[in-house]
Amino acid sequence: MSRRFARAALALAALSTPGRASADAPEGSMRWVQTGGVPFPAGVKSVLITRDDQPLAREPRGDAARRGSALGGVALPVYGVRPGGVGCPGRWLLVGPQAWLCQNQAQLSAGEPLAPGGWPPRPPDGLPFRYYFVGKGGTQAYARVEFADDAAPERELEPGFALAIVEERTKGGQSYGRSRRGLWVPMRDLLPARATSFRGEAVEGDKLDVAFTYLDKTPVYPRPEPSARPTAAPLKRLRSLRVLEETGRGGGVYYRVGEGEWVRAADVRRPLKAPPPADALPGEKWVDVELATQTLVAYEGPRPVYATLVSTGRGAQGTDTATPRGVHRVWVKLVSSTMDNLEDEDAASHYAIEDVPYVQFFAKAVGFHGTFWHDGFGRVRSHGCVNLSPLDAQWLFDFTGPRLPAGWTGVLPTEFEPGVLVRVR
């Protein structure tokens, strides 16, 4: 399995200690002092991140393990300071929960920090960026928009390459888009990606009574009998159903999904309720992936709260393209990550995608992520990862721990906020 990580994730380290507020600082201010009593500049309310995916450390040390990463251009709050040292000639700034940044890696600011929920965005289609595919003629990417079509390109992008466009400018009557990786591409060579509107269902109560269609046309029967003929109106693919009644056994099980409307259990995907893993604490959140039904259910303790369809790895257990069974924990969460040798059987036409959205790795390079290049959920399809619709990936990203603070692009767990439990069965 070949993937390139957008950010390096390091081993967990010891917990850091926050700074101490100045005794004479007014309530609600951001005025802090160092442990040694050296005052922090008055009036500073935030720190402006000057590079994208700026690493944040677990401790105020140059060799500390990674805690997460921050988005370039955002203002993060300053909660405390520590003296600099080896690897940091200035002060260490506490900019989030157990998250330290050397002062010379950012700019002090009197402006207000980014408000909670200010980033990443939450668009209605579930995609944090605007995504495009390179058309069949390929295209060229340039380091600066001034060079576009007038100088040697930085890269050649083949058909099927996908990228996130975060800015557009016009030059000579032509429109050019800047990718999140800083390259400028002619918009005339790009085709917009269209995300599916499919999303899972919230589960009410303790009963897991939801099912999903995954066939192009799911037959509906007037009664639960093998001799019954289907009605004239089959159900379309990727539709949520409430199971009102179940009857039959073996291969002849039927679900009633409406008045006089029955579907065969073999024609739909219905997740089975499962007890929490043995490692789960009482009431702890966890996620269940059922390979047989290609479904995912999010739980709080024994109670299911959300269910949806997924696409898992198509390989046999033990191979590189399988979604590995067992109990895991999410070890890093990334708003986006670049992947090649794509998580899909159509890798020949889509060989690489930049900024795949809402990635949560739980078994080395296997994890959850949003998928906008196919909508074949409910079927085995990927090269190992658990593919979700963008809306489901966004929901799951918000549901699981560790929480991503506003303005961060990635976060690693801590002792106080471990990664969510994931069981694949």
Task: Name these PLM-found stretches.
Residues 24-44, 91-139, 178-213, 256-285:
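Boundary regions of SH3-family modules and the immediately adjacent low-complexity/disordered segments
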Residues 31, 67-108, 154-190, 234-267:
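SH3/SH3-like beta-barrel superfamily modules
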Residues 60-65, 146-152, 224-231, 408-409:
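Short alpha-helix capping/helix-loop boundary micro-motifs
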Residues 1-8:
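Bacterial N-terminal signal peptides that target proteins for export
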Residues 44, 51-53, 90-92, 174, ...:
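Extracytoplasmic
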Residues 279-282, 306-309, 318-325, 332-425:
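Exported/periplasmic cell-wall-interacting domains
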Residues 230-234, 239, 244-327:
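Cell wall/extracellular polymer interaction/catalysis modules
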